[in-house]
Amino acid sequence: VTYAIADPGSDQAADVARSKRPVKVHDLAMKATGTGKLELAKTGTEAFSLLGVSWTEDAKRLKGTAQVRTRSVETGEWSGWQNLDVDEAHPVDRAEPGAQDAHGGSEPLWVGPSDGVEARVVAADGSGSTGLPKGLEVNLVDPGVTAAEAKNKALDTSGEGGAGTGTNTGTGSDMDAAAFVAEDPSASPSDPGSASPSESPVPTAEPSPTDTPTDTPTETPAVTDSPSASASPSESTSPSPTESTSPSPSPTVPTAPPSTVRQPPVISRAQWGADESTVDDPAEYIDKVSAVFVHHTAGTNNYSCAESAQLVRGIMAYHIQVEGWNDLGYNFLVDKCGQVFEGRAGGIDLPVRGAHTFGFNADSAGIAVLGDFEGNPNATPPKPAGKPTRATLESVARVAAWKLGQYGGNPTGKVTLTAAADTGVWKAGEQATLSTVSGHRDAFATACPGQNLYGKLAEIRRYAASAGKNSAIPTADVNRDGISDLVAGTPGASGGVGSVTLVPGGLNGPVPASKRTLTQSSPGVPGDSEAGDNWGAATAWGDINGDGNADLAVGAPGEDDTSGHADRGSVTVLYGPALNSGFSYATSGVTSTGAKLGSAVTAGDFNADGKADVFAAGTGKGGHWNARLTDGATQTGTLTTSTSAIAYPDATTGDFNRDGYADVALNYRDAGGIGRVTWFKGGASGLTKVSTLSVKGGRSIAAGDVNGNGYDDLVIGQPYTSESGAVSGGQVTMVPGTSTGFTTTGMATIQQDTSGVPGANESGDALGSSVSVGDYNLDGYADVLAGAPNEDITRDAVNRSNPGTAILLKGTSAGLTGSGAIAVSQDTSGVPGSTETDDKLGSAVSLTDLTGYGRTDLTLGTEGEDAGDGILLYVPSNSTGLGLTQTAILSKSQLGTATRARLGQLLTP
């Protein structure tokens, strides 16, 4: 078949565009008009990605409306008007160095790479410029490009690197294109966009902007590789989770106290590209962190986590060069993916005085979440409030618990602080009794951190007091660029030698130009490539050494040991980002010959010690399980009392009882041919085998919070009647998690005769052969993607046998539903290719965010395509729904997989 493919292309032009450059700030004065407004007419500018308005009177608020519209570098089109958050503005702490020269300002707004701006400000009472603060200007911030970002093809949206087209963003965000800036910022640009229908075009103004570029280039040092390890069961010492170095104790620098809570991985200022030359005065310190205040940065929720470092650089430049602060105001920042960034300089383990909560900075630490969780329903168009993700809430809780743990603070308790100034909530000198973890609005007259984030503070406090506060942050991001990465296992490649192919995620989706193929012959990979090893039969991501990078666990059930035990099986762990060091291990505690360890693999922090552990299962002699904890301890056991082999094991990780420890659910077919699911409960000492569910197993299993109640739920793919009691065409069953484990209350089973589900139940379709869980529409409920690789499809009156289909099922507060389900096949409009006999689309599925925007995208394995070479179909999830017309195909020619390797039979996550 002939089809459109994701062309890796030539990267020469893109590499030129991705040039390193420093942060710059451009200031444009606003002028009074006869309409009683202050305006900046449409103006061509140098590149910027973040903007705001500021004024010279720090103590004065802008009582009115400030609006901006910008021109996209990528499309050349003008955006609609966007309101700036002027209500969030607050005066700088008088103790802040240089506070006497500070300016007032709106919250900065991230707009993505732009090269034109228009702005208008009007007083709330319509009194014109006399009712507005003095010295109003528009401030444009170009966050620059670091050396590491310049080299990362995943951050290229020029069409050279990614599989998609870049329309996932909704903002035309392209860090690389921003290097192409207007040579003359005062020139009159062409206006491909148009004003709103009720407006007449505004002539281009010609102001003389005052540029305030930083002199020191922004450069991110390369992340150091994990320490090497031999191909032995002993792991290497794990590195520090952050490269931030605190200053040595001195008369002005305190000693960092130990914490009762493990420090989470933090992206240091050096790593995200802070320009220290712009910080005039050294850090100041408070006596102790008695409280933690949670903030939001307002602005936008439409950013990729690959852009978070740019956003943080932009906020730092705005705080320093626009508002006149000494440094970034917050102590820490957290993005929608749960990445934690070091904020104000001075040492993350020290009590650095921030500038985040006016009146209470002398007693607290400030954590800001990137995003707007208040919204503005009165804006035109209305601006919706964002919903904080689970990853965000848990990372905020980890940081809060760690900082409070240094000083004996209780994250669920209360604290009494003395207000240092009038804040609109408290009078100067008043004793304020607050929750130890509070929102900004509890201390200062503001909407911050927004209604939706404020409403989740109780959950942050709960998690900060649970075992989860010490747990590893779940990740599939091998190089820590903010985007999850995909792994395709091909265990049958090269006569059963086996291989895995890593396809990095990017702003446009998967980046085939940066793919990596690994075998046991690859440098640094333990073991040797041998026929029948089936290396890659199962894979899993997890931060196993605690450095913040995802590490890869690979199962090889056909591995023979050196003592003559055939098919003993093994698991290999490779440390990210390089994946060229690690260790491997085999079975213990069970019969070695035929054990086939590595038939199923998953990873999670079972003992909540800050490092992910590895769970593996083997099929030999009734089946067995093996949990490899990060201290090298191993837990093992059998699955059944039979001496015959089990089959089709598949494992998933989730916190099903919400106690903060990762649990495991293992699916398999027992020796009697019946599908089973066994629950292993996490705890301080690792995993405990709890029970086998009454609900039958099938061929696939996945976990996620489908009903949005905070407990991970179990999703079981049940394609066959004889194994699972399923309908003839297969089905998907969701089993809710609760504080005591799983329950059948609220359980839902969906098949193709369920109302709302496309198609019809037909014998042999095998719906549920593969399942994956993720939130494709960012509504807070995990959705389910299920494969039916044996689905027959009729096209042009001709039936095709087993071309396959995938069905997207939606999560709701009531659980899994068939309502609104979406089917995708190669006959779906917009999807390249066409259905063919035995293509088997849906042989594997992955519902994973491969762009960093928070919505999980669809990756569909089609293992039978091209006579068994196999392909992957990538379908982006956009703000308006599935981007079917942007579907890209990744095939043998892009990924370099072996002939007849059946690419698409296994996908991780």
Which sequence ranges carry the predicted segments?
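Basic/polar, cationic surfaces and motifs that engage anionic cell-wall
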Residues: 136-213, 221-223, 227-230, 244-286, ...
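Hydrophobic strand positions within the blades of repeat-based beta-sheet folds
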Residues: 486-488, 500-503, 518, 535, ...
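Beta-sandwich interaction modules
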Residues: 35-47, 66-67, 72, 78-132
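A detector of repeated loop/turn-to-beta-strand junctions in beta-rich toroidal repeat architectures
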Residues: 496-499, 512, 551, 565-570, ...
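Short glycine/acidic-enriched loop and turn motifs that connect beta-strands
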Residues: 491-495, 558-563, 620-623, 669-673, ...
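Beta-propeller blade termini
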Residues: 471-480, 536-544, 598-606, 649-656, ...
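Blade-edge motifs of beta-propeller repeat domains
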Residues: 467-472, 504-534, 572-596, 627-647, ...
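Acidic/hydrophobic-patterned starts of short beta strands in beta-sheet-rich repeat architectures
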Residues: 481-489, 546-555, 608-617, 658-667, ...
